[in-house]
Amino acid sequence: MSVFLSVIGALLLDALLGEPKRAHPLVAFGRLADRLEQHFNGAAGRGWRSHGVTAWCLAVLPLTLLAWLLSLLPGIGWLAEIVLLYLALGLRSLGEHALPVAQALWRHDLPEARRRVACIVSRDTSQLDEEGVARAATESVLENGSDAVFAALFWFIVAGAPGVVLYRLSNTLDAMWGYRNARFERFGWAAARIDDLLNYVPARLVAVTYALLGRTRRALRCWRTQAPLWDSPNAGPVMAAGAGALGVVLGGAAIYHGELHARPELGRGSAPQARHIEHALDLVWAGVGVWLLVLLFGGWLYA
């Protein structure tokens, strides 16, 4: 089966089913990652970088090998590829989590908006005003659109089922271990660096996609001038280009785990509102359409 048809199949499954309501494989993987971290690192953060590399290899490589073997099964390998890509995607989930935030803001129900946005961001949301909630949700849509949708598609297109499994598991470990604190500074180093490497090309393709679908010149200018100021080498281009494309100002100070972080501003334009959350989702969905067209054209060109 062609890569294009496999991607279409996975996107249809995601649209119809969404994330599995019970026993998502990533939940089981998270429990495995917790046990590995407790063994190699512990609450005291005694692990070194080498322990983190070992734990990462034990968590990711056997499952990547399994994905490769499943994709080779006669007759049903194509189905395994579709299912594995579906499990790695989060397009429908992105809307299911972000749209209720926008809807609460349209109703001016700030407590509900705070409660909803707390489900998708790690910052402290208890004191956010409506603008702060809209900013947090819009940032989440732009960044998670890159991580949970476009990067998964990229690695499936490049390396099939093993590629997307390797990427999704690596991204999950970065979310669990990639903190810059006493416990994970050394142990989580490998998970963070590998995720940065795997996201480097997809993030820049996403930034180009956002720019082409929005205010292109402003998006490219924001990417060039603002992204280098952001602390993440991949989130910076994605969010700066996305904010510029939407004509909104994102970034700025935010509280994480009780500490105030002075973040630079990203984008240019108006203050974030409920409509910007919806426009960010539109940007992601339109971007998926563009990628499908490029994939279809590429398949036809090299058929």
Curated annotation (Swiss-Prot):
- Which InterPro entries does the annotation name? Cobalamin_biosynth_CobD/CbiB
Organism domain of life: Bacteria
**Quick check: keyword Lipid metabolism in the entry?**
no
Q: Where in the cell is it found?
A: Cell membrane
HAMAP family, from UniProt? CobD_CbiB
GO terms for MF: ABC-type vitamin B12 transporter activity; threonine-phosphate decarboxylase activity
What is stated as this protein's family in its record? Belongs to the CobD/CbiB family.
This protein's pathway reads: Cofactor biosynthesis; adenosylcobalamin biosynthesis
Protein name, per record: Cobalamin biosynthesis protein CobD
Q: Name one Pfam family in it.
A: CobD_Cbib
What the entry lists under NCBIfam families is as follows: cobal_cbiB
Q: What does this protein do?
A: Converts cobyric acid to cobinamide by the addition of aminopropanol on the F carboxylic group.
